[in-house]
Amino acid sequence: MSAEPVCSALPAIPYHKLADLRYLSRGASGTVSSARHADWRVQVAVKHLHIHSPLLDSERNDVLREAEILHKARFSYILPILGICNEPEFLGIVTEYMPNGSLNELLHRKIEYPDVPWPLRFRILHEIALGVNYLHNMNPPLLHHDLKTQNILLDNEFHVKIADFGLSKWRMMSLSQSRSSKSAPEGGTIVYMPPENYEPGQKARASVKHDIYSYAIIIWEVLSRKQPFEDVTNPLQIMYSVSQGHRPDTNEESLPFDIPHRALMISLIESGWAQNPDERPSFLKCLIELEPVLRTFEEITFLEAVIQLKKTKLQNASRTVHLSDKKKRELSPNIPVNSGPREESCGSSQLHKTSGSPGTSRSLSAPQDKDFLSAKTQDFSALHQCSVNHSRNSDFCVDCQVAFCDHRTAPCSLAIVNPLSAEGNSGRFQPGIAQQWIQSKREDIVSQMTEACLNQSLDALLSRDLIMKEDYELISTKPTRTSKVRQLLDTTDIQGEEFARVIVQKLKDNKQMGLQPYPEILVLSQSPSLNFFHNKSHKK
């Protein structure tokens, strides 16, 4: 007998309204993506459950009830839930998008954030305590039980938004659905887990003190900007050490003497991670201790700290793009950089680039270095002596992406894409032509791609070493054709242009005419391309 469906007060958000879904991260609670709501015209975040087999109605309702509770927890320092996407093959919570990522990124990306001012660090600690204290004061109390720096998000002004609280059923379902233990960051969670929770029988008695232990670890991490137990790789070693009473060092090396209010903060840390749960303070007591500390900083210092971080972040993003551009010119000095996608034609013997100014053109040429030809992840494109190295890794600076054209054939359409076009100076690359086309046709592809076309796409990706075994299994083990196609398209968003081109080509090969017009691209197998190139060079 199926469970009664949950009558949710949460707004229902249809999947097709979540445009431009882009993978952000994956954790114990599911996969997080960014998206743009088609009607609201704002960026949102979507946390969706890892579903490998159909959920029972009772399981789905358990998850929806949790989401309903989270929706009621409205507070300044709690991540707002905007709605639920509840469809047969997709179950996700839609929240506000946090542009400054997580506290974990702020603390440990030291190149991006070389200095995190003390006023802001203490404000963050205070706001975490305010948020968890609010949850504990709900009726009944809402316990987080997975508090860690990855779940503390930061809005545009670096204010705290606590996420992933009250998702015990969600996490349980996600973990049971997951085929790989690696998808759950157990080591990371163990660091913040109190020792009494290593023994499941002890959980009920000590549950209200779980979050304060996690908070003590977070305080240490914020003050030191180090990973707790960073030298220990085995979670079992951490569990044994902590159960014996060991904790991260509070000596001068970890917590220097120049930390403001150092003695008070160490006292708060040590009481928070006490071995006996009954000796740990409540969050209310923590707030009483922290409020005088916050008053020692003038309001202007918080504003200055935020401006400093934003300025540093923008400068580093700009420098990254500049260095990438410089490196690209050094690697391929004769290949000009375009400002965006352009359509070109190639003639019988040489390739011309149409510049931004009408009536001007330049020949493209590139070295015949065989290292370029042997690169495993290249997106091979050329004419005669032109070859371009391409990597599927989005962090690598790609020179250029072009379609290959044989001078012995008729002129063909040639797309040149500049993957260095940054979105908002963020250093993220714009998707290529095939990726853009797939994103624009996403729902049409989901409804029209046949099982045969799907299988051919997976086989082609495997033969080109473009898909990892884990991703292949994740797609192939989905219960229905549409869920397999959705997972394939999600993977395409992550893997890049070469991956996308294979899918587009297979759709064309299978005569999926309802998806026309197709983009002008050409996918080549590696060996014919290489043979053609070598034959050309030998003939010369």
Swiss-Prot record:
It is an enzyme of class 2 (transferase). PROSITE patterns: CARD, PROTEIN_KINASE_DOM, PROTEIN_KINASE_ST. InterPro entries: CARD, CARD_RIP2, DEATH-like_dom_sf, Kinase-like_dom_sf, Prot_kinase_dom, Rcpt-int_Ser/Thr_kinase-2, Ser/Thr_kinase_AS, Ser/Thr_Kinases-Pseudokinases. Disulfide bonds: none annotated. The keyword Cell membrane applies. Residues 432-524 form the CARD domain. Residues 65-73 are annotated as: Helix alphaC. Residues 167-193 are annotated as: Activation segment (AS). It catalyses: L-seryl-[protein] + ATP = O-phospho-L-seryl-[protein] + ADP + H(+); L-threonyl-[protein] + ATP = O-phospho-L-threonyl-[protein] + ADP + H(+); L-tyrosyl-[protein] + ATP = O-phospho-L-tyrosyl-[protein] + ADP + H(+). Keywords: Adaptive immunity, Apoptosis, ATP-binding, Cell membrane, Cytoplasm, Endoplasmic reticulum, Immunity, Innate immunity, Isopeptide bond, Kinase, Membrane, Nucleotide-binding, Phosphoprotein, Serine/threonine-protein kinase, Transferase, Ubl conjugation. The active site is at 146 (proton acceptor). Pfam families: CARD (PF00619), Pkinase (PF00069). GO terms for cellular component: cytoplasm; cytoskeleton; cytosol; endoplasmic reticulum; plasma membrane; protein-containing complex; vesicle. It is found in: Cytoplasm; Cell membrane; Endoplasmic reticulum. Residues 18-294 form the Protein kinase domain. The modification Phosphoserine is found at residues 168, 174, 176, 178, 180-181, 363, 391, 525, 527, 529, 537. Residues 346-366 have a biased composition (Polar residues). GO terms for biological process: adaptive immune response; apoptotic process; canonical NF-kappaB signal transduction; CD4-positive, alpha-beta T cell proliferation; cellular response to lipoteichoic acid; cellular response to muramyl dipeptide; cellular response to peptidoglycan; cytokine-mediated signaling pathway. Belongs to the protein kinase superfamily. TKL Ser/Thr protein kinase family. Contains an N-terminal kinase domain and a C-terminal caspase activation and recruitment domain (CARD) that mediates the recruitment of CARD-containing proteins. This is Receptor-interacting serine/threonine-protein kinase 2. It comes from Bos taurus (Bovine).
